[in-house]
From Swiss-Prot:
Signal peptide: none annotated. The keyword rRNA processing does not apply. One of its GO terms (molecular function) is rRNA binding. InterPro entries: Ribosomal_uS15, Ribosomal_uS15_bac-type, uS15_NS1_RNA-bd_sf. GO terms for cellular component: cytosolic small ribosomal subunit. Part of the 30S ribosomal subunit. Forms a bridge to the 50S subunit in the 70S ribosome, contacting the 23S rRNA. This is Small ribosomal subunit protein uS15. One of its GO terms (biological process) is translation. The gene is rpsO. Belongs to the universal ribosomal protein uS15 family. Keywords: Ribonucleoprotein, Ribosomal protein, RNA-binding, rRNA-binding. One of the primary rRNA binding proteins, it binds directly to 16S rRNA where it helps nucleate assembly of the platform of the 30S subunit by binding and bridging several RNA helices of the 16S rRNA.
Length: 89
């Protein structure tokens, strides 16, 4: 269900804003998007896994809050991020 550490490190390298960046909104949103995608695949197979579904909804909410924060702070970075991640908003 969870993404591997290697995949997480790839996402951090791709979306970081500077060399030691692991906590910028872009990185957090990219990691959450990968986790949401993986959990979505799990839930397609295990339809009655309501515990994981609740976790998915919490992740989607956290990502939405981060996206709203980024949109309010820097619209250009926000637009580039949703385009590169393929998020509909």
């Amino acid at each position: 269900m969870a993404i591997s550490q290697e995949r997480k490190n790839e996402l951090i390298k791709e979306y970081r804003t500077h060399e030691a960046d692991t906590g910028s909104p872009e990185v957090q949103i990219a990691v959450l998007t990968a986790e949401i995608t993986a959990l979505n695949e799990h839930l397609r197979e295990h339809k009655k896994d309501h515990h994981s579904r609740r976790g998915l909804l919490k992740m989607v909410g956290r990502r939405r809050h981060l996206l709203n924060y980024l949109r309010d702070k820097d619209v250009q970075r926000y637009r580039e991020l949703i385009k590169s991640l393929g998020i509909r908003r």
